[in-house]
Amino acid sequence: MKKLKKDMLYVILTALGIVMIFPFFWMISCAFRRPNELLTSPPRLLPASPTVSSFIHVLFETEVPRYFMNSVIIATTATVLCICVAIPAAYSFARHNYRGKNLVMVCILLCNMIPQASTLVPLYRAMDRLQIIDTHFGIAFTHLLCMLPFSIIMLKGFIRTIPPTLEEAAMIDGCTKLQAIFKIIVPVCSSGIFATAMYAFMISWEEFLYAMTFSTSSRARTISIGLKMFSTEFKVDWSSILA
């Protein structure tokens, strides 16, 4: 009976694995097809005549590599800024009790609920005055606004699991409050910081509206904007998108 249950579990897990992997397999298979093969009926699992023409087109005939590097720079900058701001903010909420703390936390939560579209005009005017439109830092700053509220809440939960006695012991040994944060809290909370950084990086990488609004040339356009350019009013270049 136990062996039957174990075999059934393996069958179910294998089936789930196939279901999860199949979209990636299909994407790779379609990337090696010619455009006229993509919409054939019935569909084929493997390309009839594999070709790398889509990859050559994307890598050497478009600005996708530049958009990719822009995304890496912007997402990395936004993530670093987010973590640098979120750690002290989360520490303050997790360790100190002061008047209005709960109100501030509610305001942070509400900031996460504000629709992006409603912030476009004031942000555009502010960024225009600062002359950071169509720059890596400008778009990274707008991404920071998207990811910071939830990052603070995430890190607050991780920091609250650390016993305050560790910091007290460090300060007895001569550490200042700031040194205790960077020598005790940050190393102990490294897994939580890494998880928060991954969340922030993914939010920045996938963000579309701010990147489209505040980038006016290829100098700061991200990969999400680059992929959108393969889709026009009359045609969608699926081969290039999948490549």
Model-derived features with residue positions:
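A structural signal for multi-pass alpha-helical bundles of membrane permease subunits
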Residues: 2-243
